[in-house]
Amino acid sequence: MKANGQSLSSIVLALICFSCYLPPVYLFTDARLLPKWYLCVAILAATGMFAAVARLRGKPLPDGRGVMTSFCKMFTTVTVMECLWVVVCIVKDGLRPVGEVGTLGNPAELALHLCIAIPIAVMLAMGNRKRKWLALYGAAAILFVAVLLLTQSRTGLICLALDGIIGLCLLAHRLVRRKGLRCVLYGVLALALLAGTLLYVASHKTASTSGRAFILQRSWELAAEHPLIGHGHRGFEREYMLRQADFFREHPGSEYAMLADEIHHPLNEFVHVWVNYGIVAPLLLFLLLVLPLWRWRRGDRRMRPFLLPVFAILVFSCFSYPFYYPIAWLTVGAAALCALRSVLRRWQKHAASSYILPLFFFLVLGAAVVDAVQEHRWHRAYRHSFRDVAALEEYEELHSYFKRNPAFLYSYAMASFKRGDLDRAARLIEECGQHWNGYNRELLAGDICSYREEYPDAIVHYEAACAMCPVRFAPLEGLYKVYDLTGDEERRNAIARQIADKDIKVYSSAIWQIKEMCK
């Protein structure tokens, strides 16, 4: 029975690790991210439900430390498989100019997984006395570092440098006995490695770095408007692009105009939650991420495996959006559960918890299944929306479920517009604006108003889209057509000259067609 329990535990842990690297599943609107979340949440909820029922029946559960060790081994194994797949892709198709992604959505996501896996592999190697396993885990760590460099992720490189500094300092602590010399050596090693890394990061992809700085400046302005309570749920998505448009109206010749794009996240988790929920949110997030270090400093040695993986998530939180991915929640959640295990044990002694936990996990599992089914229906409606009138009926059935989802409302509005139902499209795009304001929304709103012959409103929306992303040509094309339809030759010719003189950021056939049309 014990062997069967261990086998089942290993299978569950392997599935959880596999869910983090799940390849695209083209059954949902987001083929890369949503399947990972559904599989991960379903496995965790089902496991939690069965574990809670087993505890209620008095059956023993696996030891937490053993489960953690097994998870580390499984995660290292699955990450090795991912890296080997990256190698296969390189051999087959060559190096990607923008960095390797493997089965994941972008290089930063792969870099995050590797930055979590590297310290785990090193820990397993250092904690194993058998030379065979020491060599295997050491080789895995080297493979992870090599693939991390191939992702070209600057945040991953910073994280790797900081891990290297910590490792060198620990090595110096063991080899150098004199405290004064040890401190000098710490400082020299840290400064040399960190300075070299930051110099490379600053000189690499300078346009992207400038764009990030611009986004953070506008985001700080939003946070400063409501520092205590924030702008509310989805506040960043509602307010940021409006703030970006205001900036370019005031600074039409700004150097950032060529860099501006549709933005959904400030590339900083702390700023993101601050804009949405106020100053308390980033403070709580920071405390959650430093909780393992605090517990370890208080003498809790069980927190040691979590220190560098959670530190990697902390670094990525400053430059990216790691909490979009299941691996960040798994790592931080496991660390928090381990840190608060004494509190949880006391709570588990209450009889009510024995019945609440199975019900809670059952509800989570049910919610995940329902959401997956509805997302699949949305994906099916989207695929058929351009050739099947019945797809709009399915959109309407889904509206009550997704009525607060701006991506669904935009998709439904676009489908209605393409099918010629302009009144419904106008209602939906207005409803979408309650949750999200962005370039694509303004552009579609302009097209809808233009087809409804509401030309003044169309001009307002096209001008808003122009201000949000000055580098784009589509809003100017919309303005040109509106002025042509209304017979305003002076403004039409002014827009034509603007299109002719406008610099092109990314060349495409669509842009050349616009330029030819407006000659």
Identify the role of each PLM range.
Residues 8-26, 36-55, 59, 63-96, ...:
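Alpha-helical transmembrane segments of multi-pass inner-membrane proteins
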Residues 183-199, 350-373:
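Internal/C-terminal transmembrane anchor helices
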Residues 233-275:
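Interfacial juxtamembrane loops and adjacent helix segments
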Residues 407-411, 440-445, 473-478, 508-513:
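Alpha-solenoid helical repeat scaffolds
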